[in-house]
Design a protein with these regions (language model features):
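Folded, non-transmembrane soluble domains that reside on the lumenal/extracytoplasmic side of membranes
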Residues: 1-168, 182
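Juxtamembrane interface at the cytosolic side of transmembrane helices
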Residues: 175-182
Length: 182
């Protein structure tokens, strides 16, 4: 089945607690529930509206153009803050695309989007692990947008610099000791 923009059902219209449109059941019910819960918490804490769309095919349509058109048609994000995000996966193209509103581009940059896709999502998708790829990708997106991933990354960098300082101190002490013995 090949979807057009007009064929894609917007689940949010019938249930505002649903964030995943998956008409062909590519994801398991458990994965959809997990993603819906994460994105519900994200919207409650930040106001950011997110839609995840899983489609088997869009034919020869370009995923970039399809995503932008769907994003505009659905009006994802609040009008004043333009804080929406669409995560579109097209199975037969084996591609995932993030479309962001201007209001979150400073946080969900193209580089961050690509990093999440290439490190967390695409490797799992290549193995047919649609659930794992989408759940881990959405988790990273939610952490990025609510600020917790930045805090984790900052802590990681601090830990690394502390380790390097300790290592330099130990090596320096050993060299002084060896020099004093010789």
């Amino acid at each position: 089945w090949q979807y057009t923009i007009d064929d894609v059902p917007n689940v949010r219209l019938s249930d505002a607690r649903q964030y995943v449109t998956d008409p062909s059941a590519i994801l398991s019910a458990t994965a959809r529930d997990s993603i819906n819960a994460m994105l519900g918490r994200l919207e409650k804490s930040t106001g950011i509206e997110t839609a995840v769309v899983m489609l088997p095919s869009i034919g020869d349509e370009d995923i970039f153009d399809f995503g932008h058109e769907l994003f505009r048609k659905w009006g994802i994000g609040k009008k004043k803050s333009d804080n929406g995000l669409l995560i579109l996966f097209v199975m037969d193209q084996k591609k995932v695309r993030f479309t962001t509103g201007y209001g979150i581009e400073g946080t969900m940059t193209d580089a961050m989007s690509k990093r999440i896709q290439t490190t967390l999502m695409i490797p799992r998708f290549k193995k047919g692990n649609w659930d794992g790829g989408m759940v881990s990708g959405v988790r990273a997106v939610a952490k990025t947008l609510d600020g917790s991933m930045q805090a984790e990354e900052d802590n990681g960098e601090d830990d690394l610099s502390d380790i390097l300082i300790a290592l330099v101190f130990i090596v320096g002490t050993m060299l002084i000791f060896i020099y004093a013995m010789g």
